[in-house]
Amino acid sequence: MNPEHSPLGKATVYANQYDASLLFPIPRAGAREQIGIGAPLPFFGTDIWNAYELSWLNARGKPQIAIATFYVPAESPNIVESKSFKLYLGSFAQTAFESADAVRDALKRDVSAACGASVTVRLATPAEFRKLQMDELDGLSLDRLDLDAHVYETDPSFLTASHGEAPVEETLVTDLLKSNCPVTGQPDWGSVQIHYVGAPIDHAGLLRYIISFRNHTGFHEQCVERIFVDILRACQPVKLAVYARYTRRGGLDINPFRTNYNQPMPDNARTARQ
């Protein structure tokens, strides 16, 4: 299915009963082909979705709420278009379920089917909300740099590394990522963390490269994969991980993670802007 056939940018009828058919899958392959990603993938990872507007009825008709987190493997053939995800979650609101476990099972079944891979789903109930803390991405901030930036279309020529110098291990972060929805043109705001081992990457060039996404159109997952492959090709690090946390829209935030080496799942603590 193509994005132009999705619910994005169209008049919406909100379902009042649970409806799994509202989920709109979009194949990953098309966007990957555009940036030269084929099989085998040069990375693995996860897309972490947090859903803050989930509610259903219990068996006695009383509304229940939870925050749902979805872990979608990067190896899945499809992503789910975000507005369709919102409409799907909204369809739970007037539907009775026996328990939170029954809701979680339905979410796992439906989203896994849409993505074409097994998706992990976790529900945080109100009793657990106090445990959900805010935090910022760890790393040296690129935003401290005082520099000129005038290029707002993706330009990987900014990416350079000093291959004559000793390898380093660095974690770099910036809050200046902005891209745009390819269907509606709405801005997507995010923070990105880049961890690598290899020749030192020029910090100013890396920040200018991230800033160059400002007029770029692409879904969150596609932007992170473009960042990953551009850095991998231009700077040739031995190890590379890219993790972005995008601000919420429609009750959902999307946080893609890509890496080429084994490591623990990144922390899902939301940032202040989320």
From Swiss-Prot:
<comment type="pathway">
    <text>tRNA modification; tRNA-queuosine biosynthesis.</text>
</comment>
<dbReference type="GO" id="GO:0033739">
    <property type="term" value="F:preQ1 synthase activity"/>
</dbReference>
<dbReference type="InterPro" id="IPR016428">
    <property type="entry name" value="QueF_type2"/>
</dbReference>
<feature type="binding site">
    <location>
        <begin position="220"/>
        <end position="221"/>
    </location>
    <ligand>
        <name>substrate</name>
    </ligand>
</feature>
<keyword id="KW-0560">Oxidoreductase</keyword>
<feature type="binding site">
    <location>
        <begin position="249"/>
        <end position="250"/>
    </location>
    <ligand>
        <name>NADPH</name>
    </ligand>
</feature>
<keyword id="KW-0963">Cytoplasm</keyword>
<feature type="binding site">
    <location>
        <begin position="80"/>
        <end position="82"/>
    </location>
    <ligand>
        <name>substrate</name>
    </ligand>
</feature>
<dbReference type="GO" id="GO:0006400">
    <property type="term" value="P:tRNA modification"/>
</dbReference>
<dbReference type="GO" id="GO:0008616">
    <property type="term" value="P:queuosine biosynthetic process"/>
</dbReference>
<protein>
    <recommendedName>
        <fullName>NADPH-dependent 7-cyano-7-deazaguanine reductase</fullName>
        <ecNumber>1.7.1.13</ecNumber>
    </recommendedName>
</protein>
<dbReference type="GO" id="GO:0005737">
    <property type="term" value="C:cytoplasm"/>
</dbReference>
<dbReference type="InterPro" id="IPR043133">
    <property type="entry name" value="GTP-CH-I_C/QueF"/>
</dbReference>
<dbReference type="InterPro" id="IPR050084">
    <property type="entry name" value="NADPH_dep_7-cyano-7-deazaG_red"/>
</dbReference>
<feature type="active site" description="Thioimide intermediate">
    <location>
        <position position="181"/>
    </location>
</feature>
<dbReference type="Pfam" id="PF14489">
    <property type="entry name" value="QueF"/>
</dbReference>
<comment type="subunit">
    <text>Homodimer.</text>
</comment>
<dbReference type="InterPro" id="IPR029500">
    <property type="entry name" value="QueF"/>
</dbReference>
<feature type="active site" description="Proton donor">
    <location>
        <position position="188"/>
    </location>
</feature>
<comment type="function">
    <text>Catalyzes the NADPH-dependent reduction of 7-cyano-7-deazaguanine (preQ0) to 7-aminomethyl-7-deazaguanine (preQ1).</text>
</comment>
<dbReference type="Pfam" id="PF14819">
    <property type="entry name" value="QueF_N"/>
</dbReference>
<comment type="similarity">
    <text>Belongs to the GTP cyclohydrolase I family. QueF type 2 subfamily.</text>
</comment>
<keyword id="KW-0521">NADP</keyword>
<dbReference type="InterPro" id="IPR029139">
    <property type="entry name" value="QueF_N"/>
</dbReference>
<keyword id="KW-0671">Queuosine biosynthesis</keyword>
<feature type="binding site">
    <location>
        <begin position="82"/>
        <end position="83"/>
    </location>
    <ligand>
        <name>NADPH</name>
    </ligand>
</feature>
